[in-house]
C-alpha cells in the first residue's frame, strides 16, 4: 500500500473541472507547487483545505491523473470494483463477448492502464512504474479471476525504453484467432501496442456495406490488414500498403485465413506517399480508398506539421478514389473539425467534390466520459466521391 502523505491545494477552475467529471489536473492548477513530490506518487487534492480527489502524480508530466473522487484506499478492492464495472459495461451493455478493450485508462477510471482481451489472451500497456510496482499483481489476479484468460502479456514503459515485458499465466501462448463479423484475424499480443487495433472495429464492419464484388480497394497504412480483409470477404480485389514488413506478413496470413484467392490481393512494402504518387503517375484508380495512418503528432507543438502531412496524404488518396473515400486520424491533438477542414481543403486541391456519408470515431469499448475530451482521439470519415 502506498502511504498518501502529500496534500496539494488546487485552484477553483480545477475544482470545478473535477466536479464536472474531468479526470485530469494540470500542475499549473496546484497552488502549493513547491510541495510536488520528486518521484511518482499518489497524492491528495484539496480545495479550501477539503478533500477533492486522489491522483497519480509523475514529475515527468504536467498532468495529474485522477484515481478517485472518494476518500477511499487505493487497494485490491479499488481495482476489483473498477475492473469488474468495466467488464459489465463491455459484456452487458455493449454485448461484446470474447474480444474487446477491457480497460481504457481514464475512461474506466484506471489511468495509465490499457488492457485488451483477445479470447484467452490479454495484452496490457502499463505506463506507470508506481502502479506496476505496487498493484500489478493485484490487477493481473483480478483479470484472471473475472475471465477465461490463460495469458496476460504486459508491455511496460514508453516507446524506446528498453524494459523487458512481463508474462503471466501460460508463457508460451502469444497468438489467437479472433472473429469480427464474418472476418477472422490472427492476433499476436507481442505486436505493436496491444496487438490489434480494436478501436476501428465498427468502422471496418461499416466499410463492408460500401463494397461491391469486383471493386478495386486501396488500403493505405494497412497494418495487419483489418480493412483489407473486410473488403476482400465482400468480393473486392485489395491492394494494401505499409512500411512494416512484419505487419504485412501478418496481413497476408489474415487474408489467407479468410480463404481469399491469391489473385485478389497484393501487399506492398513502402512509403505511403511515394507509393500513391507512383500510382497517380501510372493513372491507376480504385473504387474505394482507405487511409488509416499512424498519428502524425504526439504533441500539441507539432500540429502544423501533422496537418500538412494529413493534407498531402488525403490529396493523394482523393486523387486515386473513384467512388468511396475513407480517411482516418488517430492524432489526439488534431480535433474533429480541424481534421475535417484539412480533408476538405485536400478535396478542393484535388478538384473532387466529396459528399460526407458519415463521421465516425472509436469503438464504444474505448469510452469517452463527459468532461474528458482527451479520451476522444479517433476520427474516421466516409465520403462518396462525385464524378
From Swiss-Prot:
InterPro entries: PUA, PUA-like_sf, RlmI-like_PUA, SAM-dep_methyl-trfase, SAM-dependent_MTases_sf. One of its GO terms (biological process) is rRNA processing. It comes from Methanocaldococcus jannaschii (strain ATCC 43067 / DSM 2661 / JAL-1 / JCM 10045 / NBRC 100440) (Methanococcus jannaschii). Pfam families: Methyltrans_SAM, PUA. Its EC number is 2.1.1.-. GO terms for cellular component: cytoplasm. Belongs to the methyltransferase superfamily. RlmI family. PROSITE patterns: PUA. Keywords: Cytoplasm, Methyltransferase, RNA-binding, rRNA processing, S-adenosyl-L-methionine, Transferase. It is found in: Cytoplasm. This is Putative ribosomal RNA large subunit methyltransferase MJ1649. The lineage of its organism: Archaea, Methanobacteriati, Methanobacteriota, Methanomada group, Methanococci. It is an enzyme of class 2 (transferase). GO terms for molecular function: methyltransferase activity; RNA binding. Residues 5-81 form the PUA domain. It comes from the Archaea.
Amino acid at each position: 500500500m502506498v502511504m498518501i502523505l502529500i496534500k496539494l491545494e488546487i485552484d477553483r477552475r480545477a475544482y470545478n473541472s473535477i466536479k464536472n467529471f474531468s479526470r485530469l489536473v494540470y500542475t499549473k492548477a496546484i497552488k502549493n507547487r513547491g510541495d510536488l513530490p520528486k518521484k511518482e506518487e499518489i497524492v491528495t487534492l484539496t480545495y479550501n483545505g477539503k478533500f477533492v480527489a486522489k491522483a497519480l502524480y509523475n514529475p515527468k508530466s504536467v498532468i495529474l491523473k485522477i484515481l478517485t473522487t472518494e476518500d477511499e484506499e487505493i487497494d485490491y478492492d479499488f481495482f476489483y470494483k473498477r475492473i469488474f464495472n468495466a467488464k459489465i459495461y463491455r459484456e452487458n451493455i455493449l454485448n461484446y463477448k470474447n474480444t474487446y478493450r477491457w480497460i481504457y485508462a481514464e475512461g474506466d477510471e484506471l489511468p495509465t492502464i490499457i488492457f485488451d482481451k483477445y479470447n484467452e489472451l490479454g495484452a496490457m500497456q502499463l505506463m506507470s512504474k508506481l502502479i506496476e510496482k505496487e498493484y500489478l499483481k493485484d490487477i493481473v489476479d483480478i483479470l484472471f479471476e473475472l475471465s477465461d484468460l490463460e495469458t496476460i502479456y504486459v508491455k511496460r514503459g514508453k516507446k524506446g525504453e528498453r524494459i523487458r515485458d512481463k508474462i503471466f499465466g501460460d508463457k508460451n501462448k502469444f497468438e489467437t484467432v479472433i472473429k469480427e463479423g464474418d472476418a477472422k484475424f490472427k492476433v499476436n499480443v507481442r505486436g505493436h501496442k496491444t496487438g490489434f487495433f480494436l478501436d476501428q472495429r465498427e468502422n471496418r464492419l461499416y466499410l463492408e456495406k460500401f463494397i461491391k464484388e469486383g471493386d478495386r480497394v486501396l488500403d493505405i497504412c494497412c497494418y495487419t490488414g483489418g480493412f483489407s480483409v473486410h473488403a476482400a470477404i465482400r468480393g473486392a480485389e485489395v491492394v494494401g500498403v505499409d512500411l512494416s514488413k512484419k505487419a504485412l506478413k501478418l496481413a497476408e496470413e489474415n487474408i489467407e485465413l479468410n480463404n481469399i484467392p491469391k489473385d485478389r490481393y497484393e501487399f506492398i512494402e513502402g512509403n505511403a506517399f511515394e507509393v500513391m504518387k507512383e500510382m497517380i503517375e501510372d493513372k491507376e484508380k480504385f473504387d474505394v480508398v482507405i487511409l488509416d495512418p499512424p498519428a502524425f503528432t504526439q504533441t500539441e507543438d507539432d500540429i502544423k506539421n501533422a496537418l500538412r502531412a494529413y493534407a498531402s496524404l488525403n490529396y493523394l488518396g482523393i486523387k486515386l478514389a473513384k467512388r468511396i473515400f475513407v480517411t482516418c486520424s488517430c492524432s489526439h491533438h488534431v480535433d474533429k473539425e480541424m481534421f475535417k477542414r484539412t480533408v476538405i481543403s485536400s478535396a478542393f486541391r484535388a478538384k473532387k467534390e466529396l459528399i460526407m456519408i458519415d463521421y465516425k470515431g472509436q469503438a464504444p469499448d474505448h469510452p469517452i466520459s463527459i468532461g474528458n475530451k482527451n479520451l476522444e482521439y479517433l476520427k474516421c470519415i466516409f465520403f462518396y466521391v462525385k464524378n
